[in-house]
């Protein structure tokens, strides 16, 4: 019985440590015009994911779990249309500003 109590305490301790630590790398998976995540084949840092992340308004991204992950990508910029609307400086699309 004592082993079960000790095991339970260890499980609770480790779960609390994980929740206290929080997210080390806040970010998100960006989505394209169809709502799908961008697929990538070269895991880790690569030019394709950096380019995708720049389209979404952040400067750094990499391939994680075969999808592009953009660090510090906010929820409002996850979809490509919202990212363009929030970061585009094209005066033809927005003649009076945003």
UniProtKB/Swiss-Prot annotation:
Its main location: secreted. Disulfide bonds join 40-63, 49-68, 53-70. Residues 1-22 form the signal peptide. Expressed by the venom gland. GO terms for cellular component: extracellular region. The keyword Phosphoprotein does not apply. The record marks 43, 46, 62, 64 as: Important for inhibiting sodium channels, in non-edited version. The modification Asparagine amide is found at residue 96. The record marks 48, 51 as: Important for blocking potassium channels, in non-edited version. Gene3D superfamilies: Knottin, scorpion toxin-like. Keywords: Amidation, Disulfide bond, G-protein coupled receptor impairing toxin, Ion channel impairing toxin, Neurotoxin, Potassium channel impairing toxin, Secreted, Signal, Toxin, Voltage-gated potassium channel impairing toxin, Voltage-gated sodium channel impairing toxin. GO terms for molecular function: potassium channel regulator activity; sodium channel inhibitor activity; toxin activity. CDD domains: neurotoxins_LC_scorpion. InterPro entries: LCN-type_CS_alpha_beta_dom, Scorpion_toxin-like_sf, Scorpion_toxinL/defensin. It is found in: Secreted. Residues 26-89 form the LCN-type CS-alpha/beta domain. Has the structural arrangement of an alpha-helix connected to antiparallel beta-sheets by disulfide bonds (CS-alpha/beta). Belongs to the long (3 C-C) scorpion toxin superfamily. The heterodimer non-edited LVP1 induces lipolysis in rat adipocytes. Induction of lipolysis by LVP1 appears to be mediated through the beta-2 adrenergic receptor pathway (ADRB2). Monomer (edited version) and heterodimer (non-edited version) of this alpha chain and a beta chain (AC Q95P90). This is Lipolysis-activating peptide 1-alpha chain. It comes from Olivierus martensii. The gene is LVP1a.
């Amino acid at each position: 019985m004592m082993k079960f109590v000790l095991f339970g305490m260890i499980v609770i301790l480790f779960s609390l440590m994980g929740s206290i630590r929080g997210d080390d790398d806040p970010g998100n998976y960006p989505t394209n015009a169809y709502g799908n995540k961008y697929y990538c084949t070269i895991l880790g840092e690569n030019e394709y994911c950096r380019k995708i992340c720049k389209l979404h308004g952040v400067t750094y991204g990499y391939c994680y779990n075969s999808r592009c992950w953009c660090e510090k990508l906010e929820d409002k910029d996850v979809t490509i249309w919202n990212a363009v609307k929030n970061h585009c400086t094209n005066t033809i699309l927005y003649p009076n500003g945003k």
